[in-house]
Amino acid sequence: MIKKQKALIVGGSNGIGLALAMRLVKEKSVLIVDKVEPDYSQVPSDIKHLVSFRKFDLLFDDYSLFDEFNDIDTLIITAGFGKLSLFEDMQEDTIVDMISVNTTSVLRIIKHFYGSIHSRKPFYTAVMVSIAGFMSSPFFSVYGASKAALKIFIESVNVELKKSGTDNRILNV
């Protein structure tokens, strides 16, 4: 019996994450981890049983939830947020939360799945970075910085993966 593949989408309750879930569910079961439940009215009834949900806020300290998902072969991280604001007007707690959700949480999740990413067995990983991580953007200084950090992180880890001999890479979307 061939085991059905499974995708984990962090931030898959709406937007691009949910659209990816609806596309992937044609090929494999999908687990969505997000702080809000998906809008199930967007999920066709004939495939609803292939989509499951676990509530999790990326601002939590304990990421052990991700240790439960050792049966996935695809990891997609789309979670993140931005705030249109001049840096001088941004509250410090917003800065901390944005860096935590957009950058630190991604590194922590990648770390939880690094054994699978680093293995010789195919493991598909994609992170929604943003064009803001590639260029300066007034009113998006903190968001851009959080995404630029991801860009450099992914490039660096991909070099490490290549040098280790695995064909797996992290796709910067």
Which residues fall in each region the model found?
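N-terminal Rossmann NAD(P)H-binding glycine-rich loop of SDR-like oxidoreductase domains
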Residues: 13, 21
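Conserved glycine-rich Rossmann-like NAD(P)H-binding loop of the short-chain dehydrogenase/reductase
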Residues: 27-41
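Conserved NAD(P)H cofactor-binding loop of Rossmann-fold oxidoreductase domains
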Residues: 78-83
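Substrate-binding pocket helix/loop in short-chain dehydrogenase/reductase
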Residues: 86-87, 94-97
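Active-site helix of classical SDR
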Residues: 110, 146
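Residue(s) in the substrate-gating loop at a strand-loop-helix junction
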Residues: 130
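Active-site loop-to-helix junction immediately N-terminal to the catalytic Tyr of the SDR YXXXK motif
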Residues: 136-144, 156
